[in-house]
Amino acid sequence: VTYISKSNNIDQQNITQPGTTESQTKLLIYSIQTIGWTTSAKIDPFKGFHLHALFTYQKPKYNNYKVSYVKDGQTFNLDASGNIVKEIPQILVELDPSYNITENLRIWLSFRYFGKTYANLTDALYFNGHWETFAGINWNVNKHLSLNASVVNFLNQKGASGTINGSELTSKKDAAKFNNHLMSGNYLRPFTLELGASIKF
């Protein structure tokens, strides 16, 4: 079990008044605290096969993260202290099996699981957990030439990550207002085939 605390983080946050596009930029100095553990294993059950597995659980929280927004005599307060840090999953899983068909020919798979991540400071909006998958083959043709082929997102998973602009003061009861609205952000890489070669002299 590991405990980590980091103080004097500096953040320049754009705070948007709910229901409007008006925002103010605020400078915050805050702390982050987390506790968690990581378990890693390497398994070679038979010749040529190797499995690496890793599991991480963490719970990063804001501390002393407070800001006020004043507009037309109204004060909007945001206190994210005790909330889970946005964009950071609490659960991470890695599974990496591989098999050497011959001394020079290797096939491999890679699975990455990212748990639920919050998309705003109040933990009112979040993205569901998702898998990211990869696969490939590596062939050392000779001492001068190596070939490889890989597939990104071979399960064709779809999903988003990051934050949602303008949602800093959004409460959990108002989160439904973001349903069925187009928004910009980050997304999982689509199904992709990649080929490569390496030449050594």
What are these regions (language model features)?
Residues 50, 82-201:
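Conserved C-terminal beta-signal and adjacent last beta-strands/turns
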Residues 2-7, 23-117:
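Gram-negative outer-membrane beta-barrel transporters
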Residues 11-26, 63-82, 161-184:
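Solvent-exposed loop segments that connect transmembrane elements
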